[in-house]
A protein has these predicted regions:
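Non-catalytic, hydrophobic alpha-helical segments
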Residues: 13, 68, 147, 178-182, ...
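NAD(P)H-binding glycine-rich loop region in Rossmannoid oxidoreductase-like domains
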Residues: 5, 31-100, 186-187
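N-terminal Rossmann NAD(P)H-binding glycine-rich loop of SDR-like oxidoreductase domains
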Residues: 1-27
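Active-site-lining helix/loop region of Rossmann-like oxidoreductase modules
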Residues: 154-157, 161-215
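Conserved Rossmann-fold NAD(P)-dependent oxidoreductase catalytic core, especially the SDR/UDP-sugar
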Residues: 7, 12, 30-32, 36, ...
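Conserved SDR Rossmann-fold cofactor-binding beta-strand/turn motif
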Residues: 33, 148-153
Length: 215
């Protein structure tokens, strides 16, 4: 059983990731929490939590961790300073901590549009921050996967997706399906050292990831 640290565990997508991991036979989740009062929520789920702030020191959060899922984010609608602090610099801190701890894989939740943030003026600063974090991970020396979904919805997941390194189209995908993409990206050698965009589609998540991995 591999121990997985989840940053952003209290967020809408992160909670779904925790639930999937908690029902898995292969993974044991550890939720990264910012406030002590958040611990009870995970204790009720019989999930362990570790206190750590992405705007502070996170090196202690890697003890016993095999792999990491970064699903944290300011949401794109917070102030620019918060976006930079969490989505960019917070991600970098966790990447550094993971590298120092010799973590085996780092799975990043990113976003479509990071290849050219200037194309989306409303989210340009957010996408620039995500791009900075993505590039930092690519150059970190860690094994990684970067998942770049389209617009996230709270619809029930259909477990059917469309993925490619570049999809050349816009669209939506449920948080449920994104959470499964993040968890399935933990498996080796699936999507190792790859970035891919994701939308709702016609293929099962597993077959889509196997196909893009060229296995």
């Amino acid at each position: 059983m591999e121990n997985i640290l989840i940053a952003g565990a209290t967020g809408a997508t992160g909670k779904r990731v925790i639930e999937i991991l908690n029902n898995s036979q292969a993974f044991s989740p550890l939720a990264l929490i910012r406030d002590e009062e958040q611990r009870q929520m995970f204790e009720d789920m019989e999930v362990e939590a570790v206190l750590g702030d992405l705007e502070g020191d996170v090196s202690h959060t890697m003890k016993g961790i095999d792999k990491v899922i970064f699903a944290a984010g300011s949401g794109g609608k917070t102030g620019k300073e918060k976006t930079t602090a969490v989505d960019q610099e917070g991600a970098k801190k966790l990447i550094d901590a993971a590298k120092n701890a010799r973590v085996k894989k780092f799975v990043m939740l990113s976003s479509m549009g990071t290849d050219d943030p200037s194309q989306n003026k409303d989210l340009e600063h957010y996408l620039k921050a995500k791009k900075e974090a993505d590039d930092y991970l690519r150059n970190s020396g860690l094994d990684f996967t970067i998942v770049q979904p389209g617009a996230l919805t709270d619809d029930m997941g259909l477990a059917k997706v469309k993925v490619a390194e570049k999809l050349n189209e816009k669209g939506e995908i449920s948080r449920d399906d994104v959470a499964f993409l993040l968890v399935m990206s933990l498996a080796d050698p699936l999507v190792k050292n790859m970035s891919f965009e994701a939308l709702e589609g016609e293929k099962s998540i597993k077959s889509a990831l196997i196909e893009i991995s060229d296995l």
